[in-house]
Amino acid sequence: MQDGIVRVWLERKGRNGTPVCIVRGLALDGVALAALAAQLKRTCGTGGTAKDGEIIIQGDHRARVVAELEARGLRVKRAGG
């Protein structure tokens, strides 16, 4: 999905009902992706990881994640969940 829009998903499947936010569609290399993941984790005050070209943030923090990404000038869309 490389249409220039970053999508923020809420997912519970396979996580015992615990919600996580998944950020997909970022065109960043591994180092930049990890740095953005660290900033999002600080903004949300929670844990998370960056792997397979996605950022996973623990908990339902879609509003904060969308606001932070839009502040960085990215086109963001809430999707799923």
Residue ranges and their predicted role:
Residues 1-42, 49-52, 63-81:
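Long, charged, low-complexity intrinsically disordered regions
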Residues 53-58:
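A generic structural motif
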